Every structure is written in structure tokens, then in C-alpha cells.
Amino acid sequence: MKFVSMKSRGGDYLVVAENVAWLRTHENGQTQVGIVGSTPNLVAGTIEETAATILAG
């Protein structure tokens, strides 16, 4: 299981990379991260930056 650290304006998340289902652009330069079996997390950064963070793990 690989955890990825994601920055958020309200606090940081440790997300299991394998549980990321989708990414969606949100307002103010943020991205929604869809999590399998959960509600989406709102993280700081563009969709490209978020994808790169997940892939770099």
C-alpha cells in the first residue's frame, strides 16, 4: 500500500494511491480527488500537479 501526501487549504491528507478513482478541476486552482468508497477530497494544485504527485508517490 502506497500513501501519497496531498496538501489542502484546510489540512493535509495521506491518500492510498491505489484508491484514487478520478481527478476533477475545481475552483481557485484546486482539484477534487475521487476516492473509492468515499467522498472526494479537495486538494490544492491543478489537476496536472495532483496527477504528478500521485504518480511520483
Name each region found by the language model.
Residues 1-57:
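Acidic, Ser/Thr- and proline-rich intrinsically disordered linker/docking segments
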